[in-house]
Amino acid sequence: MLGDLFTKPKKRKYATIPSDGTKADVPEGIMTKCPECKKIMYTKELQKNLMVCNYCGFHHPIGAKVRIDMLVDEGSFEELDANLTTANPLGFENYMDRIEKDKQKSGLNEAIVTGHATIAGNPLVIAVMDSRFRMASMGSVVGEKILRAVEEADKTNKPFVVFTASGGARMQEGMISLMQMAKTSAAFKRFSNHGGLIITVMTHPTTGGVSASFASLGDYNFAEPGALIGFAGRRVIEQTVREELPEDFQTAEFLLKHGQLDDCISRLDLQNKLSFILRIHAKTPETGGESDGE
């Protein structure tokens, strides 16, 4: 009996049961993993929170029409120039094939949606870029739609609010795309000279020719938290200046800290912030001047 204490225990035997190859019937898209904190949450809960992570506050990218639906009063949006589409002025190989793929992927005809709307009853002309379409690069149609939207705001005496998200100028349109930087900037200047109010909201990412032109020309320049905002890439700058850049370089928080933004606003607070600004700048029908915000 005592000898049993010193004998080696017998190894347990395990049987492997083959899988039948079936998977649990979980609907695709029911869960979303945050790329920032790696937490997994129900997609519906994330959508209820305006696609802002419930755990870390990361702002997930959203499409133009989703953003408009989140922001403006229900039923108030009237789209402008919806059928304006891109040509291929330089005959760039496969360009139109890529445009067609992006149309199918995004449901849009171009990388920006513009139109009339109201926010908490305050009228405005709004433009929202969509990075699913050619990374919202600015070509001739994007520039033209911004120009027309600004002119519409000028004509109707409404503020202009633009949400930017872009990889910069569209290389497939060459010099024509670069011309849009001057074209949009000049439109902003004319509108400003006429007393128009411009609000820009930079979202992730706002880079290249868009950041270097109209995106930075608002009377109010805002950004969503964590947005990448800059002209050239980080590595290019470091190689040029031969210095190591700060960890938070080219983020919305870095720009705010250095006086290049008026505020960094969570998507959850943006509607209230915009409605307040639109209200205090509202022009009274009697005088055409700004109201006292009462």
From Swiss-Prot:
Where in the numbering of this chain does the CoA carboxyltransferase N-terminal domain appear? 30-294
Where's it mainly located? cytoplasm
Which keywords fit this entry according to its UniProt record? Answer: ATP-binding, Cytoplasm, Fatty acid biosynthesis, Fatty acid metabolism, Lipid biosynthesis, Lipid metabolism, Metal-binding, Nucleotide-binding, Transferase, Zinc, Zinc-finger
Tell me the compartments it is located in: Cytoplasm
According to UniProt, the reaction catalysed is: N(6)-carboxybiotinyl-L-lysyl-[protein] + acetyl-CoA = N(6)-biotinyl-L-lysyl-[protein] + malonyl-CoA
Q: In which pathway does it act?
A: Lipid metabolism; malonyl-CoA biosynthesis; malonyl-CoA from acetyl-CoA: step 1/1
The record's annotation in PROSITE patterns points to: COA_CT_NTER (PS50980)
Q: Do you know which HAMAP family this protein is assigned to?
A: AcetylCoA_CT_beta (MF_01395)
Q: Would you tell me the protein name for this molecule? A: Acetyl-coenzyme A carboxylase carboxyl transferase subunit beta
